[in-house]
Amino acid sequence: MEAAQDHGPGLCCKPGGRLDMSHGFVHHIRRNQLDRDDYDKKVKQAAKEKARRRHTPAPTRPRKPDLQVYLPRHRDGSTHPVNPDCEEASESSSSGSSELEPPGRQLFCLDYEADSGEVTSVIVYQDDDPGRVSEAVSAHTPLDPAMREALRSRIQEELAKRQSRH
């Protein structure tokens, strides 16, 4: 079976069974294939550019401030401070005594914020004197006598409230 058989004078097939490239329909098919290849290249290039743009850092936007998280005390009843800020303040406030921690159970951590925004943290224990705690706060943040007395009375109220619960 040869495709190059001569079928008569009306048919114009070339020997070898090849397509007649001079025909307009074949030119249209080839042009369509080339256009499709060019389009695919453009789409792939655009996808690569878009992927590169995604990896660039986004402009910084203001974030929400850190939320205060409740940290419960340890079940074993230990007096380890749960707030790292309080640990530093307790070390500095108890530097005058020979013990590292006063005897007794830790009741709460007092955070005093001054008008300047500076926060002073002091751990208050069960056996603490409210006057001593207010002096420890005023050592870090200067307080006038009226403010010191108001702080002492507030510490006294908080101590009484917490000692009555336990």
Curated annotation (Swiss-Prot):
It holds the Pfam family UPF0561. Residues 91-101 have a biased composition (Low complexity). Residues 32-49 have a biased composition (Basic and acidic residues). Signal peptide: none annotated. It comes from the Eukaryota. InterPro entries: UPF0561. Residues 32-107 are annotated as: Disordered. Coiled coil: none annotated. Belongs to the UPF0561 family. PANTHER family: UPF0561 PROTEIN C2ORF68. This is UPF0561 protein C2orf68 homolog.
